[in-house]
């Protein structure tokens, strides 16, 4: 029984897809356990970029099983589109399995997402308008439609009719918005269900059988710990649990079967959308990092906010997700800077604190306390070991490991598979 969980430790966009793809080489099953198509991940294979939003990164290994678990909310329209994209690129999807217990995102979820965000005015939370939150709301309210329901024509029609009638009343009475048509949605989405039917099964059986047989299973999280609905910067969060604990709920695998948790982070910090960001940069250094790091959202295309590495955030992520290993990405983006900074603590009203406050009002008053290290000018994109890094870059990497309190297993100096360097094999140490 061997399992590894990959989680983002910041606000998403840390390079989880790349690290999952890298670790997938030694896994036999790869599974997503939460989120939806609001999370984009980019994988580079032989110089070619593949951008996925819903299907696990492991799909590029045809001999391995890729799983969309029950904790994921699935937009069938997006899924069918993504399948077609992969097929057009010559990628087989015969190895995909989708949980029959996963909940379905429907057009009324997306419309409600947009209307709710618009109604917030200046208090918007920066949702991707993918219907994720409303779909999870229906799930919690026990009125959601699952993949198993989508495949049954009569059940789907009955539940869609009830849900749409309620949502249309809401659209018309509360938001003065146009109601949606039952027949159009039913016809379109039932057809999508038939297209994905071949992939649908009880994925908890597949995952537990694989683990019981001694196979290596890799769990892939979406977003990041700081976007977790319980542990993140609430309410500027997603509607699910990206933390490692979300695996057990979102996959049907018990906590006793989880061996390692790999936390993925960048050598700096980025965030899409609104919400607290203590180390955010507004100067030319921030702009340089954004441009060199191509910091634009995979899903939204929006410029990401960028800032210095925040070890307070990282220690919070380590604690609430039980991180055992760290994967440090995008070190190369910092090349050329005269100095680099790491936030080691916050100043809150004159008091030094080393924890991440839950209160948004306190976070607004938090000022980062920095440790400054000398930068490096060398191009490190061809580096293949820690010893090959310039001394200043090597010291920066080591200092991050010390401040976070987790050993660094891999570090990356570019987007390619070959630019990921192993310091310690996660699989071998289990």
Curated annotation (Swiss-Prot):
Binding site for Mg(2+): 13, 40
Lineage: superkingdom: Bacteria
Residues binding GTP: 12-18, 40-42, 304, 330-332, 412-414
Binding site residues for substrate: 298-304
Biological processes per GO annotation: 'de novo' AMP biosynthetic process; IMP metabolic process
Catalytic activity: IMP + L-aspartate + GTP = N(6)-(1,2-dicarboxyethyl)-AMP + GDP + phosphate + 2 H(+)
SUPFAM superfamilies according to UniProt: P-loop containing nucleoside triphosphate hydrolases
A single GO cellular-component term on record: cytoplasm
Cofactor: how and how many bound: Binds 1 Mg(2+) ion per subunit.
UniProt entry keywords in alphabetical sequence: Cytoplasm, GTP-binding, Ligase, Magnesium, Metal-binding, Nucleotide-binding, Purine biosynthesis
One GO MF term attached to the UniProt entry: magnesium ion binding
HAMAP family: Adenylosucc_synth
Function: Plays an important role in the de novo pathway of purine nucleotide biosynthesis. Catalyzes the first committed step in the biosynthesis of AMP from IMP.
Record's protein name: Adenylosuccinate synthetase
Organism this protein belongs to: Streptococcus pyogenes serotype M6 (strain ATCC BAA-946 / MGAS10394)
